[in-house]
Amino acid sequence: MEQSFPLAQSLAAMAAISMLPVIAVIATSFTKISVVLLIVRNAIGIQQTPPNLLVFAIAIVLSAFVMNPVLQNSWQLLLAHSGDFGTVSGMADGMIKVAAPLKDFMLKFSDAEVRDFFVQASQKIWANAPATPIASDNITVLTPSFLVSELTRAFEIGFLIYLPFLMIDFAVSAILVALGMQMMSPTVVSTPLKLLLFVSIDGWRRLLEGLVLSYAQ
């Protein structure tokens, strides 16, 4: 008969808790949101405003909002299968069941082409491994696929956001050269104009709404 392992349960719980920050970064919307916010800050030209702490705090709050359905589903599954965590094998099965909503989330927002690449790469890199071939919905494929897909989308959004601010920089530089004011830094003039543009179009609300609603597919 399989015995209970309270020590193993404690160690597994500690390991799971220690992995939460990593999971929050690589398996949630945090990556895309934080990268887009940092790109916007650089595009405007205010390198330290808002500070990194505030940028990441905004990303955490928005990620918690986006991931709320996933967290609720995982919590309900944890309560429903709490009795399975009495043994080591039951604990492993229970963790797989609890992680199912997060796995579905990553599957939904990862590109099929990227998943296929990692499946093919695993067949080449792990050719001599004793493990059986993995599918495209395996967690070892989903995690890097989701991360790469999120980074790709973040840079696509950042490129589109960067363009109007870049045009302001070009226009200001051309005007200063035409006026013979080459000694004046274009940043001194362009930064207030970019801030004015961002505020006039209600940039923060539109940006954050767009980031949140991008997960409403």
Stretches found by the model and what they are:
Residues 1-217:
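Hydrophobic alpha-helical segments and their helix-loop boundaries in membrane
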